[in-house]
Amino acid sequence: MSRKYFGTDGIRGRVGEYPITPDFMLKLGWAAGMAFRKQGNCRVLVGKDTRISGYMFESALEAGLSAAGADVLLLGPMPTPAIAYLTRTFHAEAGIVISASHNPHDDNGIKFFSGQGTKLPDEIELMIEELLDQPMTVVDSSKLGKVSRINDAAGRYIEFCKSSVPTSTGFEGLKLVVDCAHGATYKVAPSVFRELGAEVTVLHAQPDGLNINENCGSTHIESLQAAVLVGHADLGIAFDGDGDRVLMVDHTGAIVDGDELLFIIARDLHERGKLQGGVVGTLMSNLGLELALKDLDIPFVRAKVGDRYVMAELLERGWLVGGENSGHVVCCNHTTTGDAIIAALQVLLALRRRGETLAQARQALRKCPQVLINVRFGASKVDPLEHPAVKEASARVTEDMAGRGRVLLRKSGTEPLVRVMVEGDDENQVRTHAEALAKLVAEVCV
């Protein structure tokens, strides 16, 4: 059965445009509450990032859940992985995140966690979708859900993050710049690193509801690069708006992406005999990551793009680490979902154990030139990926690369975009092919 509302990462869109409206969120809260109550008594955690519309949608979800008889625990602004963790530790039936991740403030969305802190099973998502098409009812007033607020949520999560670092290890003498993207990590991330001994300069930690991800964070890393250089910091850490993505900047100002961070973590586990299997990347992972892991005899597999698919592959194989070049990094030895703070801590630990700088550690992975171009296709009824001209051009490029690279065309799961990616050993050739393919995709979408 195809989904009407749920995409690869929940439900997302422009605030005020269906389904990102208060009336839909009320109905969604009710439908979710009814679905979760079928599992027994129901308690649901609700958290959000810092965008202004989160208050409106929090109230709507709260009302819908209560109408279905579900008790609601409000967390306030918290990183997405914190909501997964707290859902687990409170033994709740589910957790709900109000966030549009790295998108601007005028977008918002909803995603769910199961009681185990993992993405919601497909059958529960489908049950919620079916209930959304049914008339809304209200349980007897004696069975309405109660609502309360967890006032120590941030402190609980800070202590959890710190517990991933051995008590014998600290980060004294380490000079960090941390960019919180005016998002959900603005309180907890600086506290975690400072309490572990690091000297921390904080950027973009003054959310006003409108400035989340605005020219800051992991999608706009220029100000972090400048701050690292000006402050002579050892490295910089950039989070996205909901705290599930992380990128870094070394002391020279060079960007260290998710592929490189994943390699540093995996190599550290491998050297200590704790890797447990291999590494999961995605179709977008740089070929250089695959080759660097191969040099260490570490197995590597590619999942579909999206942290839920990385997580599913890890669970199926019983492996521990995986991630995306965008900065989603999953460490199953600590978490049940991508957690930017946990991933950053594991990188810092790996550097400490080896006595390396971040700039030195990233040299072990030689990335292949890769060009990614996003093409917006709007309301076009043409499927560009199935268009004969696009298929033929893609095949020609693959043939021209002669086994020295690869081509990937795919639709974004969260935005109306086609992502055109070409990768190979010749940067000029890669860019020429990517630009030609992107131009063709744009033409057939008109």
UniProtKB/Swiss-Prot annotation:
Mg(2+) binds at residues 101, 240, 242, 244. Activated by phosphorylation. GO terms for biological process: carbohydrate metabolic process; peptidoglycan biosynthetic process; UDP-N-acetylglucosamine biosynthetic process. Its EC number is 5.4.2.10. Keywords: Isomerase, Magnesium, Metal-binding, Phosphoprotein. The active site is at residue 101. It is an enzyme of class 5 (isomerase). Gene3D superfamilies: Alpha-D-Glucose-1,6-Bisphosphate, subunit A, domain 3, Alpha-D-phosphohexomutase, C-terminal domain. GO terms for molecular function: magnesium ion binding; phosphoglucosamine mutase activity; phosphomannomutase activity. Binds 1 Mg(2+) ion per subunit. The keyword Phosphoprotein applies. The modification Phosphoserine is found at residue 101. Coiled coil: none annotated. It catalyses: alpha-D-glucosamine 1-phosphate = D-glucosamine 6-phosphate. It holds the Pfam family PGM_PMM_II. GO terms for cellular component: cytosol. Catalyzes the conversion of glucosamine-6-phosphate to glucosamine-1-phosphate. Belongs to the phosphohexose mutase family. This is Phosphoglucosamine mutase. It comes from Pseudomonas putida (strain W619). The gene is glmM.
